[in-house]
Amino acid sequence: MTQPASSRVVFDPSNPTTFSVEAIAAYTPVALIRLLNASGPLQPGHRVDIADARSIYTVGAAASAARARANHNANTIRRTAMFAETDPMTWLRPTVGLKRTFNPRIIRPQPPNPSMSLGISGPTILPQKTQSADQSALQQPAALAFSGSSPQHPPPQTTSASVGQQQHVVSGSSGQQPQQGAQSSTVQPTTGSPPAAQGVPQSTPPPTQNTPQGGKGQTLSHTGQSGNASRSRRV
């Protein structure tokens, strides 16, 4: 009886525990036939011939090949799983790698950047200068508009002239001529004529008017003075 050198278990037809694909396939068909016939028929009244041995061998070889493929696939899967378990990129990437790079809870001190500091300090100073310049530019037209719209707050450079002309207007409307000292201290208008009392004819008529002496001339002179006063206030 020939023993297969590559079989791990010796095939014994009388012992079912030794039935294995590798042990049966390790025998040649002739050796298998001799082994089966020597140990007795597996079925009563039936002897194993070459056809049975060939079928057994073919089935054994196919089963052995299938078992080898299964083992190969299992070993491949096992090796892949072991490689995945022992691969440092598989285990360290979600733990050390992510903690080292993407964990927001870890706050690291960063050195100060001079360009960022200059960029931050620059805009804090410039808007103050531009704001003061804008305020000064806006205050001047506002003061001019305010002084031109309301006669109660005239600009400082036209205070004396406007006050003197207001005195002329008040004295002309009331019928009394202003005093000589007040006329000398104030600025006389350039286009109008000195006021005259109501009911008293003027000695010299205005050079620009051809109307006779009377109320119309007085009214025109008063309106001219008031117009000069309004012009002085608008300046």
Curated annotation (Swiss-Prot):
Compositionally skewed regions (Low complexity) per UniProt: 158-188
Give the intrachain disulfide bonds: none
Q: Which Pfam families match?
A: Herpes_UL35
Subunit structure, interactors included: Interacts with the major capsid protein/MCP.
Q: What's an example GO cellular component term for this entry?
A: viral capsid
| Localization in the cell | Virion; Host nucleus
Q: Where is this region: Disordered?
A: 104-235
What is the stated purpose of this protein?
Participates in the assembly of the infectious particles by decorating the outer surface of the capsid shell and thus forming a layer between the capsid and the tegument. Complexes composed of the capsid protein VP5 and VP26 assemble together in the host cytoplasm and are translocated to the nucleus, where they accumulate and participate in capsid assembly. Participates in the assembly of the infectious particles by decorating the outer surface of the capsid shell and thus forming a layer between the capsid and the tegument. Complexes composed of the major capsid protein and small capsomere-interacting protein/SCP assemble together in the host cytoplasm and are translocated to the nucleus, where they accumulate and participate in capsid assembly.
TM segment ranges: none
Q: Which family does it belong to?
A: Belongs to the herpesviridae small capsomere-interacting protein family.
Q: Which UniProt keywords apply?
A: Capsid protein, Host nucleus, Virion
Protein's UniProt name: Small capsomere-interacting protein
Whether Ribonucleoprotein counts among this entry's keywords is no
Q: Where is the composition biased (Polar residues)?
A: 127-139, 220-235
GO biological process per UniProt: viral process
Q: Does the keyword Cell division apply?
A: no
